[in-house]
Amino acid sequence: MVQLDVEKTIEELTLGEKVALTAGIDFWHTAAVPRLNIPSLRMSDGPNGVRGTRFFNGVPAACFPCATALGATWDTKLLYEVGRLMGEESIAKGAHVVLGPTINTQRSPLGGRGFESFAEDGVLSGILAGHYCKGLQETGVAATLKHFVCNDQEHERLAVDSIVTMRAMREIYLLPFQLAMRICKTACVMTAYNKVNGTHVSENKQIITDILRKEWGWDGLVMSDWFGTYSTCDAINAGLDLEMPGPTRWRGTALAHAVSSNKAFEFVMDERVRNILNLHNFVEPLGIPENAPEKALNRPEDQALLRRAAAESVVLMKNQDNILPLKKEKPILVIGPNAKTAAYCGGGSASLDAYYTVTPFEGVAAQSQGEVTFSQGVYSYKELPLLGPLLKTDDGKKGFKFRVYNEPPSEPNRQLIDELHLESSSGFLMDYKHPKIKTFTFYVDMEGYFTPEEDGIYDFGVTVVGTGKLFVDDELVVDNSKNQRQGTAMFGNATVEEKGSKELKAGQTYKVVLQFGTAPTSDLDMRGVVIFGPGGFRFGAARRVSQEELISKAAELASQASQVVIFAGLTSEWETEGYDRDHMDLPPGSDEMISRVLDANPDTVVVIQSGTPVTMPWAHKAKALLQAWFGGNECGNGIADVLYGNVNPAAKLPLSFPVRLQDNPSYLNFRSERGRVLYGEDIYVGYRYYEKVDLAPLFPFGHGLSYTTFSRSDLSLATTPEKPQLEDGEPITVTVSVTNTGSVAGAEIVQLWVAPPPTGVNRPVRELKGFTKVFLQPGETKKVEIVVEKKLATSWWDEQREKWASEKGTYEVLVTGTGDEVLKSSFEVEKTRYWLGL
């Protein structure tokens, strides 16, 4: 790669070459113009790790804690380090652009991708995202803020019209993007799938050009979300530089014709191409060649950072009687469906093949010096557990053979064209390629051998984007090839799981074969659903057992145990891109299991893994409760570090946890109805709503305990004289002394809130405006400083003036942290002023 003379290159490009540059060539790569030294660039998903170019059978990668977990750290320095490692992982995968971070706003607990965004509050989300992007882009890799804007649900996400006031748009949904840009102007922004107030964002000139480019002064590249381009002229004229993925649906000859007929002017094309060429120059110093090989890092220092991030994200919600930390020398009973499952990431674009994973059970067992026993407690799978890791190949390897043919199984003498060895029995083939496969229609036989450990009836399940028949010892057990029903897996492309059963004997080996046909072999009506390539498959199995049997056994064991910890929650099956949750509840049986174990042993520690809030009807019984999110590669070790006191928890909730779904402010206005969703809660998202209506959530935004105690004192506040025009340069500086009054070293998160004066405008009771994190030894005191610009601390969006308004009056400053202590001060705004810009 070489630095391009952008203006000279634009002059030398033909119209056809310009058109080609504005669309991808495949799922992950941009177009090249070799004669002008313009190379193809590679992009890769990056919500919580850099997957590389393959969903299917890809090169393993580091998996970071999910964004809500990172949001819970409230730690800008950690987010910077995470960003740097993300950049280094991207370089290892030969990718110039990371498609992240996501900074949408969780207006509902049910959003399928809620775990991908940092927080319900724009200040917390935007500041963390800015430091993350700063770390990432300092490696030379381009970051992509997404999804711009109001992509806050999965239901009908390609078509839904988000009806939102401009005030809510500015104060809630655009704010994290605005604040992130103040810290780091990212090289790229990705548009949202949805419409906003009647127009798809990818062709919304007000959002892309007027706000992002003109008002904020941003000059990077705007790309579509994958298949999120819906027009030729409208999108190119609105400011959408790049349609992804390729091959193009809307550009190509259609765009060339539009330019020749003056429906899109060539000077507009030049602007689109200019932004694309500027991106080339941004990433050129990386020296990553076209189609670079994908490598793994997995360095010890990276593992240490991932473990620290996992541990520092764990929120201590309750700790009555100082049950935690646990005693390493005492025996421990581990219970629950998440104990031996590594719930390390959510589903969809966030999913990847991690270098390794550590389950909570493994994390506890590695640190306990006493006996560690296990009880399942309940099964919480949405679909039957993957069978692949329990299979063996005919030559004794873990997993199964994946044999590819162009002809169906009914064809005699068909030719084997590819054979792979796989362990995971879940595969999305969107990026599978082979030179002998010319179309999306082909067939795969997956064959392995299963030896059950227990007698019993075993249930088998098959989910496909395509068709599938599962045989056990040549007996058809599951037929998912006819009368198929659409489900939610694989971005909403897959069928529901079809099941069958067979009685098996312990110790006997059975041959298991899945005959799979790709997506075109299915008779499922897929109108309105984007088909990603040739389809996908998933097959699982489990011994049939009653939940009552499992719960009773767990409760009995708990009644006799000296230390008990439950690991329950959700997984990537329940929280994933492609669909929203129907409710906030844990999977069936989990609440009853937790409640009965707590009755049997009230000192049981409960650990919940989820990316977003869940209901906890047993919370009043639990003395010790942790929220542990999806913790990445090191989730099990990170949780165990907190349980045993190696790490003193300091995390605070980045989301409000309502008592029940009906309490959340978007309850009446979530999901698409007749093609639209009304953002009826307006600016009252999350804590802004609960505080305004004086409705206590189960656990509030910003909540989190510690193994030590802190005090805050000596609050001082300094302002600067007001200028005629309100702009940057009028900082409010808040200084406070923080003391560790306990006996354990630990970190405190100091939160700065501002409460507005009473005016004629309805405003939140208070809003977060700044925060900092400080580590203190027992008895140590440190002064900390939080600085926030007056315009950001005081303003609301005036829809009549179409400007931010900082109104005259007395503003109260509140400083909070761990515990109930609140320090207060105030400052004056002497006259009302208005402003625009970043």
UniProtKB/Swiss-Prot annotation:
GO terms for cellular component: extracellular region. GO terms for biological process: cellulose catabolic process. Keywords: Carbohydrate metabolism, Cellulose degradation, Glycoprotein, Glycosidase, Hydrolase, Polysaccharide degradation, Secreted. Residues 395-555 form the PA14 domain. The active site is at 225. Pathway: Glycan metabolism; cellulose degradation. Gene3D superfamilies: Galactose-binding domain-like, Glycoside hydrolase family 3 C-terminal domain, Glycoside hydrolase, family 3, N-terminal domain, Immunoglobulins. Coiled coil: none annotated. It comes from the Eukaryota. Glycans are attached at residues 197, 493. It is found in: Secreted. It catalyses: Hydrolysis of terminal, non-reducing beta-D-glucosyl residues with release of beta-D-glucose. Its main location: secreted. SMART domains: Fn3_like, PA14. Belongs to the glycosyl hydrolase 3 family. Beta-glucosidases are one of a number of cellulolytic enzymes involved in the degradation of cellulosic biomass. Catalyzes the last step releasing glucose from the inhibitory cellobiose. This is Probable beta-glucosidase I. It comes from Aspergillus fumigatus (strain CBS 144.89 / FGSC A1163 / CEA10). The gene is bglI.
